[in-house]
Amino acid sequence: SKDKLHTLYKLLCSFTGGQSIVFCNHRESVDRVAAYLREQKIFFEAYHGGMEQEVRERALYKFRCGSSNVLVSTDLAARGLDIPEVQHIIHYHLPGSEEAYIHRTGRTARWDADGCSYLILHSEERVPEYLTTGVDDYLLPERAARPQPPLWTTLYIGKGKKDKINKVDIAGFLY
């Protein structure tokens, strides 16, 4: 488990940009990976069905608008989400079926964009039979710098018309 976490960290550090989704099979695994990435000072958002709806929506919003470059999720994020420009799909756990693999990997390379899918395998795990072609080893660099923080920050203001606050007030405050 620690080996896979360290491998995930090195893999994320090897990317020179772009957004990544890390897929885990269980909510507890998402929480464990999130705790590790937090320790390593990686900017990320977690997303799974055990979270409150509002928290999940904020996580997706931050990921979509570029305030976070990594989304750690269960298969909840594998279907029905419209997230353009995801360049890296990381299967921290092997998907349970070929269909799950297809849906997870389908989050990248959308609309003629380029993208890659990565499997992090423990020494006792093997590449699934449905992936017998087109699988290459990815050699991780010995040393790589921690990923840069996102260029954007999301500012959430839970106020609106009822509170007599509008866009101009916020823009004036930030300027």
Language-model-derived ranges and their functions:
Residues 70, 79, 97-138:
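Conserved segment of the helicase C-terminal RecA-like domain
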Residues 140-175:
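Non-catalytic terminal extensions of ATP-dependent helicases
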Residues 12-16, 36-39, 61-65, 81-82, ...:
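Conserved catalytic network of the ASCE P-loop NTPase/AAA+ motor domain
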Residues 30-36, 42-74:
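Conserved helicase ATPase core of P-loop NTP-dependent helicases/translocases
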Residues 16-18, 40-43, 68, 84-88, ...:
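Short glycine-/polar-rich loops that comprise or flank the Walker A/P-loop
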Residues 60, 70-92, 99, 111:
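P-loop/Walker A NTP-binding module and the surrounding RecA-like catalytic core of P-loop NTPases
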Residues 1-4, 26-30, 51-53, 76-79, ...:
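Conserved nucleotide-binding/hydrolysis micro-motifs of P-loop NTPases
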Residues 1-36, 173:
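Conserved interdomain hinge at the start of the Helicase C-terminal
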